[in-house]
Amino acid sequence: MISSYTFGIYPRSEELIEATRKNTENLPSLFQNMAASKGKSTFVDTKTNGGATMQFHANDPLSYQKMNSSDWNYVVLQAQSQEPSFPYGQVNAQTLPYADQLADTANQISSCSQALFFMTWGRENGDQNNCENWPSVCTYDGMDDLL
């Protein structure tokens, strides 16, 4: 689970795990309102750790407690905002194995669970802290293209 939300549509349920600031945008409420507009009842549970990486969530026992807390139909994972924009070798070594671990675990807990990946966001002015070493992230457009 990544800084996360858990959403459910009865009798189905969904869990969103994310590592970014989406918690400030009240995504669970937006999801509930959208489902309600279609006559669906929803259940929302959250786990948010702003700025946490996939590796953090894969190593956090609470991630697995949340996944085990219900028969989720969907487990939605979102990487920390910079994480997928880093060089491919770094993403392949430091992000994807943990994303796979979380997705595989969701499916092992319930064979009906489907892991979905929710695109993270590029920073308005790019990633200035990493710009010198990875120029592709110097601007929003450059960072967004990598995401």
Task: Kindly label every feature range from the protein language model.
Residues I2-F7:
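Short polar catalytic/cofactor-binding loops
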Residues M119-E124:
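Short beta-alpha junction loops
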Residues D127-L147:
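Substrate-gating cap/lid alpha-helix
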Residues S85, N125-G126:
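Short, solvent-exposed loop/turn segments at secondary-structure junctions
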Residues Y98, L102, M143-L146:
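Internal, well-ordered alpha-helical segments in soluble enzyme and binding-protein domains
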Residues D104-A115:
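A short helix->loop->beta-strand "cap" motif at the edges of active sites that frequently abuts
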Residues G8-D100, S111:
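Conserved SGNH/GDSL esterase-like catalytic core that processes O-acyl groups on lipids
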